[in-house]
């Protein structure tokens, strides 16, 4: 079994060694320009067109949970990968736990009003504030995939009312499920904290705009953990300035790194991190990939395959 690996920043030698230990019958090599030798599987992140074009691969593994970048490249260069070759994304590989940590810590930060206390501290004001109740702090999750399910599970332990909005109905215990555009308003009207975990598709680009934000309760919060292109940043800033939103926590942006001139840097109600909410953890990724390749070789059912038509 031949496996080729490409990632512009990862330590290729480590990955090659780890994969060969996990799959003793495989020969793994780092792909370099000009390498046209046969391969059965490819592990990639932002691969050049020529790496995959013309290859008769059994499967391609994308070294991350998001596949929007490679799907966009495939649309622009259909010769890059035959449509019959399955494409897999990393379903969890430690990302679920990281998303849980991030979401829970931020929801609790707002629930306990630590943002307000930081503002008071900056003014040297000693002023206890009224507490929020859990009943008035409903959390709504947009996107009900693997990571959305993990986040809902972790928040459930804290007793917050939970709801999710997705393409298909979910039957998660203790979580109200809303489906499609026709139920979006009802989902938003009672959502105090909006967590975005949607996939990046043509239907979801720019979805968090003034029209959507206006349907949230006054004083709501937005936590974006998905993709920067989901948010119309000017509309978000306008909602913060008007008081419609009380705060926003952003891990992703329409342009990364975020330009120095962006007003998001200086807005007092915006907190941010540099796209680190959930990163690929190599050991967990190796375990998932080696297990999935073994299942594919045996003809067993697998999970994590990308639906190219849906975009995730």
From Swiss-Prot:
Keyword check for Lipid metabolism: no
InterPro entries: D-isomer_DH_NAD-bd, GhrA_Enterobacterales, NAD(P)-bd_dom_sf
Pfam families documented for this protein: 2-Hacid_dh_C (PF02826)
GO molecular function, one term: hydroxypyruvate reductase (NADPH) activity
Record localization: Cytoplasm
GO cellular component: cytoplasm
Protein known as: Glyoxylate/hydroxypyruvate reductase A
Organism: Salmonella choleraesuis (strain SC-B67)
Gene name of this polypeptide: ghrA
């Amino acid at each position: 079994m031949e496996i080729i690996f490409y990632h512009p920043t990862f330590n290729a030698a480590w990955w090659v060694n780890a994969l060969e230990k996990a799959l003793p019958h495989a020969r793994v090599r780092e792909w370099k320009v000009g390498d046209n030798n046969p391969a059965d599987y490819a592990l990639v992140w932002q691969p050049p067109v020529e790496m995959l074009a013309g290859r008769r691969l059994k499967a391609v593994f994308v070294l991350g949970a998001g596949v929007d970048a490679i799907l966009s490249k495939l649309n622009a260069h259909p010769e890059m990968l035959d449509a019959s070759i399955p494409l897999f994304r990393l379903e969890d590989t430690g990302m679920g736990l990281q998303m849980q940590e991030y979401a829970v810590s931020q929801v609790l930060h707002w629930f306990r009003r630590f943002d307000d206390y930081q503002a008071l501290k900056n003014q040297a004001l000693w002023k206890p504030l009224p507490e929020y109740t859990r009943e008035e702090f409903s959390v709504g999750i947009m996107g009900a995939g693997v990571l959305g399910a993990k986040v809902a599970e972790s928040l459930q332990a804290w007793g917050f009312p939970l709801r999710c909005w997705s393409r298909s109905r979910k039957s998660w215990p203790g979580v109200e499920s809303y489906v499609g555009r026709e139920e979006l308003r009802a989902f938003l009207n009672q959502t105090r904290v909006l967590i975005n975990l949607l996939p990046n598709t043509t239907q979801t680009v720019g979805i968090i705009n003034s029209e959507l934000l206006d349907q949230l309760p006054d004083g709501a919060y937005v936590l974006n953990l998905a993709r920067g292109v989901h948010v119309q940043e000017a509309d978000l800033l306008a909602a913060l300035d008007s008081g419609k939103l009380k705060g926003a926590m952003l891990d992703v942006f329409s342009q990364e790194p975020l330009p120095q001139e962006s007003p998001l840097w200086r807005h007092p109600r915006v907190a941010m991190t540099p796209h680190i909410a959930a990163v690929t953890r190599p050991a967990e990724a190796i375990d998932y990939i080696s297990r999935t390749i073994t299942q594919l070789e045996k003809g067993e059912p697998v999970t994590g395959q990308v639906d190219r038509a849906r975009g995730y």
